[in-house]
UniProtKB/Swiss-Prot annotation:
Belongs to the protamine P1 family. This is Sperm histone. One of its GO terms (molecular function) is DNA binding. Residues 1-62 are annotated as: Disordered. It is found in: Nucleus; Chromosome. Keywords: Chromosome, Developmental protein, Differentiation, DNA condensation, DNA-binding, Nucleosome core, Nucleus, Phosphoprotein, Spermatogenesis. GO terms for biological process: chromosome condensation; sperm DNA condensation. It comes from Gallus gallus (Chicken). InterPro entries: Protamine_P1.
């Protein structure tokens, strides 16, 4: 999804550069927060649930 959106912004006029920078700044903190929460839950959870969580995480990414 991210690659497709980047290619779209490139095809647009120079205005896309401004939008791209704004979206990048807003998205980076959101992504960091999601990764942090996922890592914390993984550590607290046991081995069996760990494998199940990884499968769910992969489905979300794709």
């Amino acid at each position: 999804m991210a690659r497709y959106r980047r290619s779209r912004t490139r095809s647009r006029s120079p205005r896309s550069r401004r939008r791209r920078r704004r979206s990048g700044r807003r998205r980076s903190p959101r992504r960091r927060r999601r990764y942090g929460s996922a890592r914390r839950s993984r550590r607290s959870v046991g081995g069996r649930r760990r494998r199940y969580g990884s499968r769910r995480r992969r489905r979300r990414r794709y």
